[in-house]
């Protein structure tokens, strides 16, 4: 099995534009390592758009463990110096992670080529085939 081809990850100006249109704090929440997420964001030239990376080596547990989501919420509240409830828009390709997110009352967005099957999963708020299409549609709503 060949290694991950980081050099093939290049800037996507449309993705950058779409992310910039959302004037909200953005976070990466991944089961990958911090270094993996950081290298990908840097290669895409979008690292500066994210406030923090939550990764397998920076939080106590991984998705879909509900304690993982709780620790991310607590850290965001701590870092934003607020106790008020935040609205979390959570994008993921794995249904089990989205199910846990819905248990935390997060707004769930499934990114999958099977997005048309959304109706089968009551814990999904939205479903799109790609992150860019999701951002285009969600910008009209939020």
Regions found by a protein language model. Give the residues of each.
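Short, acidic loop-to-helix structural element flanking the phosphoryl-transfer center
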Residues: 2-28, 34, 38, 66
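Small/polar loops that bind or transfer phosphate-bearing groups
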Residues: 28-29, 92
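Asp-based, Mg2+/Mn2+-dependent phosphohydrolase catalytic module
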Residues: 34, 38-142
């Amino acid at each position: 099995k060949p290694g991950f081809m980081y050099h093939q990850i290049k800037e996507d100006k449309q993705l950058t534009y779409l992310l910039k249109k959302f004037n909200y704090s953005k976070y990466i929440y991944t089961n990958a390592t911090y270094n993996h997420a950081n290298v990908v964001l840097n290669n895409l030239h979008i690292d500066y758009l994210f406030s923090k990376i939550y990764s397998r080596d920076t939080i106590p547990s991984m998705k879909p463990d509900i304690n993982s989501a709780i620790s991310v919420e607590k850290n965001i509240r701590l870092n934003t110096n607020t106790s008020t409830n935040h609205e979390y828009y959570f994008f993921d390709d794995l249904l089990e992670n989205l199910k846990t997110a819905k248990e935390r009352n997060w707004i769930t967005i499934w990114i999958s080529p099977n997005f048309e099957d959304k109706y089968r999963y009551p814990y999904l708020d939205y479903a799109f085939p790609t992150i860019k299409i999701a951002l285009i549609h969600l910008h009209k709503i939020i």
